[in-house]
């Protein structure tokens, strides 16, 4: 028999931990301004959706093998990603994109720019969630967006052709599938593809290293929430009076609401992945103070600069700094131009370390005197610089004693304080001799 008291006692800490986690998740969601970002992305999506569809159609028209695939892909997207109310929206967008394909070269270029701005806005939002202030620049940014706008449609078309082949194969396999495994596979296939799409979005869009295991967990959870949203949204629309109030115009506010909710789920998934990463690397972040962490990071940069190599996110994480901790310090280092981000997404040293002091590093991270005097336990990853730092810490303690080694009687007498302060430099010079 189960001991109910023991079961409750074992479950209670887990429930509290889960509650704290989702409480922090909601707090991060609000603090990062995800609701406002979702509204902005909804507004941008209305302008970018037609250009994106026009670009997709243009890419498919360049390859005769994909003839007719564009319409199939559009039908598949609206059947799996938009509730039942999206049929009218699909027709409107198809008409708009058809007209967009008849534009002049200047008009087509403007549409491509609109789609490009949509992608940059998405990246900025994800970077804000991850605390990354430096966006992709130069050739890296161009290649990423070019791949999305050109190779992306072709990959989707290839995937659709493969799914068509599987559907034809399904007819043959069904004759031999007595237990219905094939039907089960095809019923969950949209969930698998949606999970893969969200995982790729969470892992590739932010301009930082995102652990793939956390991106995968976030992608699956977001896909599940997305499917639940489709069901719930369809039920609400079917049982509401939108059509009676707005008539044929009801499709516009409903579609706006749907896109806004979709972006909120996507941004919530991004915050979830970030929160998972923060908790997963919390033990690494807490082992170093900010000062010791930035010294450890700069030691890595110095070692890499000797051989002309650049530094990756993984180099700093493997040094024990911690992913989230490293991202926080990276923002400060890039703001002060101590390090720079290359077009490949790696990092190089910008300052001559012979001109940088430990005091400069302490001011960079806002370290206090107590943190300077405190030396954490030495770890196997630390270099020889740690011993020299400990010596300086002892000298700092002696210097602090010289400044604060006065009696309270003298402290409370302003005249004696002035005399002692005048004598301090002479005493320190004699001590140094």
UniProtKB/Swiss-Prot annotation:
UniProt cross-references to Pfam families, sorted A to Z: Virul_fac_BrkB (PF03631)
Membrane-traversing stretches: 46-66, 103-123, 142-162, 185-205, 217-237, 247-267
Disulfide bonds: none
One GO cellular component term noted in the UniProt record for this chain: plasma membrane
Keyword terms: Cell inner membrane, Cell membrane, Membrane, Transmembrane, Transmembrane helix
Keyword flag Isomerase: no
The keyword Cell membrane is annotated on this UniProt entry: yes
Location of this chain's protein in the cell: Cell inner membrane
Membrane topology: Multi-pass membrane protein
Database matches in PANTHER family: INNER MEMBRANE PROTEIN YHJD, UPF0761 MEMBRANE PROTEIN YIHY
Protein family (similarity comment): Belongs to the UPF0761 family.
Record-linked HAMAP family: UPF0761 (MF_00672)
This protein's name: UPF0761 membrane protein Sde_0901
Lineage: Bacteria, Pseudomonadati, Pseudomonadota, Gammaproteobacteria, Cellvibrionales
């Amino acid at each position: 028999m189960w001991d109910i008291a023991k079961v409750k006692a074992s479950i209670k800490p887990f429930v509290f931990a889960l509650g704290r986690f989702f409480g922090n998740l909601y707090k991060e969601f609000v603090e990062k301004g995800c609701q406002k970002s979702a509204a902005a992305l909804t507004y941008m999506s209305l302008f970018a959706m037609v250009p994106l569809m026009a670009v997709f159609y243009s890419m498919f028209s360049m390859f005769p093998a994909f003839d007719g695939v564009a319409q199939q892909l559009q039908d598949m997207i609206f059947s799996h990603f938009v509730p039942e109310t999206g049929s009218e929206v699909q027709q409107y967008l198809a008409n708009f994109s058809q007209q967009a394909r008849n534009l002049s070269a200047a008009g087509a270029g403007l549409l491509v720019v609109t789609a490009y701005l949509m992608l940059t806005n998405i990246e900025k939002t994800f970077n804000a969630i991850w605390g990354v202030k430096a966006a992709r620049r130069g050739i890296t940014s161009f290649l990423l967006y070019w791949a999305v706008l050109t190779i992306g449609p072709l990959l989707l078309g290839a995937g659709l052709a493969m799914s068509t082949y599987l559907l034809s194969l399904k007819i043959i396999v069904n004759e031999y599938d007595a237990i219905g495994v094939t039907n089960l596979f095809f019923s969950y296939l949209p969930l698998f593809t949606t999970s893969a799409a969200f995982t790729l979005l969470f892992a590739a869009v932010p301009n930082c290293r995102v652990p793939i295991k956390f991106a995968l967990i976030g992608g699956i959870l977001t896909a599940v929430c997305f499917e639940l949203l489709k069901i719930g949204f369809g039920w609400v629309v079917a049982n509401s009076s939108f059509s009676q109030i707005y008539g044929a115009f009801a499709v516009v506010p409903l579609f706006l609401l749907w896109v806004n909710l979709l972006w909120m789920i996507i941004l919530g998934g991004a915050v979830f992945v970030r929160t998972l990463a923060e908790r997963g690397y919390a033990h690494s972040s807490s082992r170093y103070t900010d000062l010791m962490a930035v010294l450890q990071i700069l030691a890595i940069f110095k070692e890499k600069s000797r051989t002309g190599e650049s530094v990756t996110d993984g180099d700093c994480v493997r040094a024990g700094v911690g992913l989230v901790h490293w991202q926080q310090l990276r923002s400060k280092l890039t703001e002060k131009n101590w390090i720079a981000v290359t077009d490949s997404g790696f990092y190089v040293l910008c300052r001559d370390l012979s001109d940088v002091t430990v005091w400069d590093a302490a001011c960079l991270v806002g370290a206090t005197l107590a943190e300077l005097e405190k030396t954490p336990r030495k770890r196997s990853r630390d270099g020889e610089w740690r011993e020299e730092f400990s010596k300086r810490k002892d000298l700092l303690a002696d210097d602090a004693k010289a400044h604060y080694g006065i009696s309270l009687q003298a402290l409370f007498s302003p005249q004696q304080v002035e005399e002692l302060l005048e004598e301090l430099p002479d005493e320190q010079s004699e001590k140094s001799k």
